[in-house]
Amino acid sequence: MNIIVVGLSHKTATVEIREKVAFAPTQMEKPLHALVSLPDITEAVIVSTCNRVEIYATTRDIAGGVARLKRFLADYHNISLETLEPHLYSYHGEAATRHVFRVASSLDSMVVGEPQILGQIKTSYGYAAEYKSSGIILNRFLHKAFSVAKRVRTETKIASSAVSVAFAAVELAKKIFGDLSDKTVMLIGAGEMCELAAKHFINTGVRGVMVTNRTFERAVKLAEEFDGKAVNYEELFDHLHKADIVLSSTGAPHFIIGPKNVEEVIRRRKMKPMFFIDIAVPRDIDPKVNDVENIYLYTVDDLNGVVATNLEQRNKEAEKAEAIVEQEIGQFFKWLSSLEVTPTIVALRSKFDEIRRAELAKTLANWKELPPDAEKRLEALTSAIMNKLLHQPTSVLKRAEQGNRNDLYIDALRNLFELETTRPEVEELGELEE
């Protein structure tokens, strides 16, 4: 069985492309069930964040599985595959494992070391577990990814020198306005990114924070944490003119702020400049807003410029993290290979031993008088012959296991000898590692 990855990220696709293939976190049941209904796709997990959309799956047919996942992404979102394919990447085997371990460890993030991606993958895995689209392989695979990320976080200082996307947004605001002590911030959304942004804005000494959210109680809760003010979502445009900086991160499927809204707001501000940061995918703010005078709109892609200057220390820590990833890849593949190889070897030996015992029993039944130790000697002789015969195929299978080339041999043996194998039980892992 092979692990495959198909997806796109901020490295291969603009926000305009990414938002077209984003999956709503509250509507994962349908696409997950559709994925595991595809031919040869046995398990699947969808990871959909601001900066990436990826599908992790298991299949016996690598080329066919990758093609089906690409077609699924295009068809599910009503996009032509010709439009989407240039932005897609795919991995299988060791490369897929390396990619997911690196993603979970934030080594592939826009901001290396940011902690949000691990939580996002855990949430994605939670949906797959809830809707039963993940199984023995992806369960173990993602728990391994979580433990790799934990090792990276505890054994390196990669997180200590990292800046999150939310922090990058604050840094961008400082570049636009300079001193933020007389500025008021409006947060649209009350999720993790807005909470992080609120912390960073408060630390820079902004004058005040307003929070609005479709669920007013969540807005109140976040606002209270920072001595801010909660605003009813329906009254957003009654209060927007009071904000100098607006950061939006909701899960809305369409624009919630357009140019006409902003034209009215800027008039009420007597043309005082406003800074909008849209870190939602799909985007919350119509890009035409940027055409309004004295309005400055930035998206998640614009944050690349803020975070492009990686510190030397972070790069050194990233090298340590990469070494951890490489070490863990080998350990995971040893387990994955044994999942197929060990039961096959056991089944092969069992089949041969069954035949040996049956034939030996027939032979002994036809001999009326035997020396006292004859049965014991014949037992040893036939066992030795069987072991000699099985030594070479067993050795080849074990060598193939180490080289990750075992599927061909396993399938051949199962077909030639009509083997029935049962995978070994894998211990159920409890709570997700923090």
Curated annotation (Swiss-Prot):
Pfam families: GlutR_dimer, GlutR_N, Shikimate_DH. Its EC number is 1.2.1.70. Keywords: NADP, Oxidoreductase, Porphyrin biosynthesis. Substrate binds at T49, C50, N51, R52, S109, E114, P115, Q116, Q120. The record marks H99 as: Important for activity. The keyword NADP applies. The active site is at C50 (nucleophile). It catalyses: (S)-4-amino-5-oxopentanoate + tRNA(Glu) + NADP(+) = L-glutamyl-tRNA(Glu) + NADPH + H(+). It is an enzyme of class 1 (oxidoreductase). NADP(+) binds at G189, A190, G191, E192, M193, C194. One of its GO terms (molecular function) is NADP binding. GO terms for biological process: protoporphyrinogen IX biosynthetic process from glutamate. InterPro entries: 4pyrrol_synth_GluRdtase (IPR000343), 4pyrrol_synth_GluRdtase_dimer (IPR015896), 4pyrrol_synth_GluRdtase_N (IPR015895), GluRdtase_CS (IPR018214), GluRdtase_dimer_dom_sf (IPR036453), GluRdtase_N_sf (IPR036343), NAD(P)-bd_dom_sf (IPR036291), Shikm_DH/Glu-tRNA_Rdtase (IPR006151). Pathway: Porphyrin-containing compound metabolism; protoporphyrin-IX biosynthesis; 5-aminolevulinate from L-glutamyl-tRNA(Glu): step 1/2. Homodimer. During catalysis, the active site Cys acts as a nucleophile attacking the alpha-carbonyl group of tRNA-bound glutamate with the formation of a thioester intermediate between enzyme and glutamate, and the concomitant release of tRNA(Glu). The thioester intermediate is finally reduced by direct hydride transfer from NADPH, to form the product GSA. Possesses an unusual extended V-shaped dimeric structure with each monomer consisting of three distinct domains arranged along a curved 'spinal' alpha-helix. The N-terminal catalytic domain specifically recognizes the glutamate moiety of the substrate. The second domain is the NADPH-binding domain, and the third C-terminal domain is responsible for dimerization. PANTHER family: GLUTAMYL-TRNA REDUCTASE (PTHR43013:SF1). Belongs to the glutamyl-tRNA reductase family. Catalyzes the NADPH-dependent reduction of glutamyl-tRNA(Glu) to glutamate 1-semialdehyde (GSA). This is Glutamyl-tRNA reductase. It comes from Geotalea uraniireducens (strain Rf4). The lineage of its organism: Bacteria, Pseudomonadati, Thermodesulfobacteriota, Desulfuromonadia, Geobacterales. The gene is hemA.
